[in-house]
Amino acid sequence: LLSHDKGNTMRVILHALDELGYEVDYRVIDAQNWLPQHRERIFISGFRRDIPTNFTMEDVEVPVGRKHVLSDILHPEDGSEIAEPPFTVGQIAKVADKYTLTPKLWDYLQRYAAKHKAAGNGFGFGLRGPSDVARTLSARYYKDGSEILIEQGDGIPRRLTPRECARLMGFDRVGSNRPWLIPVSDTQAYRQFGNAVAAPVATAVASAMAPWLTNTVAIRSRKCRRV
């Protein structure tokens, strides 16, 4: 967004918010500080000018120290997780075979990546293991899953399941007693999670803004009581 149309798109957005009477700030935040996914997104905050605040997006606390890796969100496939058909099946809750790429698709992705590499282009599938960080999950993931493929030893890799996508976006976690409800098809789930905002990042932004809103409500409440 920052570079779209040579920055004009962002300028139009900021100008529109300014005209509406908002004091605006923005910041690019990478979700990999919370989740095992490299996902840079612009977060824009806005307070009406009649609300007294010194808030800036730099007030958003970004956790440091722990590196999040894919094993945090992958199905363990060791029996420690209850099977959840159609995502996982059997006594050890193994990922269902349908998430493994077909030999034809895997062959195509390898040839396509090799062709682009030879031409000096940047296309390549994102093959990842349990100790890695994923590429950005996008709404096109349902097509071939190429941006995040999970290694399966020497075999053909697989896509993430929708449940793993929910975890990758911070809506769910391994071992949750109340897993995020996924009432739609895999295709729709991939689209929706790929279009979503990483939940813990949104929570961090909202948590940083909330005290200013609470303070404003308290001030106005006191003024009303005096009247």
List the model feature ranges, each with a label.
Residues 1-136, 140-142:
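Class I S-adenosyl-L-methionine
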Residues 95-227:
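C-terminal target-recognition/interaction regions appended to catalytic cores
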